[in-house]
Amino acid sequence: MGSVDSLLKVKDIVGHQNEPVIVVVSALGGVTNQLLAMTEQALSKDSAYEATLALVADRHMDIISHVVPADRQAECREFVGEFINSSLAGMLRMLCLNDVPADIVEDMRKSIVSFGEILSSAIVTMMLDATPRFAPGFIKTKRSGGEDVLDAELTRRLIKSEFGGSQPPTTVTQGFIAHDAATDKDTNLGRGGSDYTAALIAAALGATALEIWTDVDGFLSADPRVVPEARLISKLSFAQAEDLCNGGAKVVYYPTIAPVRDSRIPTWVKNTFRPDVTGTLIGDEMSTEAVVGVTSKDDTVTVVTRVDADLALLADELMRRLMSEGIVLIPVARTPQSVTLRLLNGQAATVVPLMHKLLLEHE
């Protein structure tokens, strides 16, 4: 959600739904990074954060003027302006002018980074004339191993309670942000957590489907930035999707798959800007392609196939063919539908185009 055009596309997509929908929104594109940058500037006693804050405010106000109906703009501007110029500015000013203890800084950082979703959800709620819901009221985390992790059972119960009974035509809530179950402090589900929030809600409610609208057509057989001829994967099993995400595909935040897999919720990944493109359906049925896709992360490459593929034979063939190009790979992990290979003498991303070509030949 980075522009007026994308938000108007969201409005059109929601308007074509024939049953009640819950819309889970992320921050406007780039805003989370700006919030983090302003926090660090303020901690460094650098007043340059004020210029970025003004840019953030201007951008939100400009979007309001283009997407929110005229009769609701004043209310939306008042909320967004108060939140930015009072709440957000006040926290940044406190960090800039005071020596704040480290534990409080961490709490404030989590609060500041949550503002992006709160602001965008206010705009989308007003744009759609929807019913708002505050996600931290039902998305809960707990401390484990020094980190904030989802309190899954509590979250599931609270979602059922929050959304029990008849639903309004359109509900809007925030992705990513949460509250600690014990302290009620601001926390979050990690970058990419908006997909995860949507999956948790869909799973808890037994939704008809989960639709993840993004800026690509769906899952592709490789990263199109390095393999321009990468093809759209029309269908994936939950396990195949998990392996692609775990192997480096960034289309969907990796933890998103587990809740919908466990509850058997069909999940579509589609392009906001090209809604007529079929997209990728993630469900019980696996892709019919012998070789589904290849992804890379750090120094590893993961190849995802059908379950009935001979992975050992495929891995041996890939290693033999690539060794003739001076590229050495060793197998390091395997699932029923994937094999992960470690690259010993270079970066995995540079190997992906060649491997993709070899895999297509293998078919």
Regions found by a protein language model. Give the residues of each.
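Nucleotide/pyrophosphate-binding catalytic subdomain
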Residues: 1-252, 337, 342-347
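Short phosphate-binding/catalytic loops that engage adenosine nucleotides
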Residues: 19, 265, 327
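Glycine-rich beta-alpha junction loops
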Residues: 28-29, 216-218, 271-275, 286
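Short gly/pro-enriched beta-turn/loop segments at secondary-structure junctions
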Residues: 205, 262-264, 296-299
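A conserved active-site cap/scaffold subdomain adjacent to cofactor or substrate pockets
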Residues: 235-283
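A conserved regulatory-domain signal marking ACT and ACT-like small-molecule sensing domains
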Residues: 278-363
